[in-house]
Structures are given as structure tokens and as C-alpha cells.
């Protein structure tokens, strides 16, 4: 006997992927998330491919995962996908100490962040 299946929190035309423990500050990750918010999935992938930000590689992985979830788990058409939401959350902050002059030490903060990407299938517009 297993637990009853939980209701989906997303509508039927949406799929999501979450990347956790990304070793970057949430502010820097949000700069890259702003690039893809509201874009078509194919255009967002192209933007991330040529972005010079280090974290863009991990954001691209997460977006590809969301697209794969949409295609394989929810039977959505990949060509009609749009990045409806891309939001960033705070993770843990590792604290380290660095030696300074005169026998003192300084704190170094190493923040982590989380990224959630939700893709939505929109109806293809009929070209007239």
C-alpha cells in the first residue's frame, strides 16, 4: 500500500525544473535569470549559450531539464514552450576565514543560490 499521489501544483500546460546549491550569489544569478524570463525556450537557450557569465552554464542545464520534463513527463510541444517564470532563492552561506595582517582574520562569505524555471506551452499563432 502506497501513499496517495499528490495533486500537481502546476497547470497541465506547464513544467518546471529546480537547480539547488548553485555556488553563486543570488544577485548574480538573478542577472542571468532576467535574461531568459518571458523568452521562447529556443531563444533563451541561444542567449545562455553565448552569455559570458560563468553561471549561465548551470542555468542552461536547468532550462534544458525543464524542457525535457515538459516533453517527456507532460507531453508538451517543445517548439511552443516559453519561459514563464525564472526565479532565484537564497541558499546557505558558507563562512570561511582568511588570515589578515597583525594576526587577525577576516570572514569570507561563500553564498549559494537556488534557481526555479517554469516553462509554459503557448498556442502557436496561425500565420496568415
Curated annotation (Swiss-Prot):
GO terms for biological process: translation. The keyword Ribonucleoprotein applies. The keyword rRNA-binding applies. One of its GO terms (molecular function) is rRNA binding. Keywords: Ribonucleoprotein, Ribosomal protein, RNA-binding, rRNA-binding. Pfam families: Ribosomal_L22. InterPro entries: Ribosomal_uL22, Ribosomal_uL22_bac/chlpt-type, Ribosomal_uL22_bac/org-type, Ribosomal_uL22_sf. One of its GO terms (cellular component) is cytosolic large ribosomal subunit. This protein binds specifically to 23S rRNA; its binding is stimulated by other ribosomal proteins, e.g. L4, L17, and L20. It is important during the early stages of 50S assembly. It makes multiple contacts with different domains of the 23S rRNA in the assembled 50S subunit and ribosome. Part of the 50S ribosomal subunit. Belongs to the universal ribosomal protein uL22 family. NCBIfam families: rplV_bact. HAMAP family: Ribosomal_uL22_B. This is Large ribosomal subunit protein uL22.
